[in-house]
Amino acid sequence: MKIYFTRTILLASHLNNDFLKIINEFKEPENKENLLILFKKHLESIAFDKYNSLIQEVLEIESKKYNLKNKMEEILKIKSLEKFLNWHREIILSLDFAELSNIKFIQNNLIHLSQSNWEIALDEYWNASIVLNNLSKPPKQHYFLFQQTGHYDSILETNVVEYKLSKYEYFLLQQFYKPKELIIVIKDFIDVFEVQSSVEYNALYSEIRHMLKIMIFNKLIIPQHNRIIQI
């Protein structure tokens, strides 16, 4: 359980010493489907006063990640699909951008966009003090995503990874909730900004192209006909 709800436990224990005692005595159920229910019940038994909304938001996000993890047979299917997408991605990225921009892309349905009032997403450099410091800051909009992958992390016991996103990456990805040509997305995205000169336009255009290529490389957006229907 401590693996799945690291941030919630860390924050709750920091705010209330009684919670740490409860967690240390917690016995995980054999049925993992009941784990989240029991964990929430234990969390609700402790008062966090003005921090309740923060605790609930962190728990909600970690619960989402927990519920996204796949069974081993599903992970193997994703792995097989990733091999195909990797092969096709190399072909796509070798195209001239003028040709690439006319292809319809859509969000990979294995990614799940999220936002929070605190910087919750973890990276490989995280530690307890960083997490607690981030959660002590005033609320501010932060963006990230969860991605179901074909790799099972035996230490974290999940195949779900998380990535921090900039505001622009988040809103750019949102444009692909339905199939769209890159050229249309670029135009719509640039129209949001009040571009004053050709220099500003070219700089913005170049940055959007760069973000889109990274999204394609990371399989966050994929050609419409490659959309994974079901796992």
Provide a role label for each language-model segment:
Residues 101-103, 135, 155, 211:
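Homeobox/homeodomain signature
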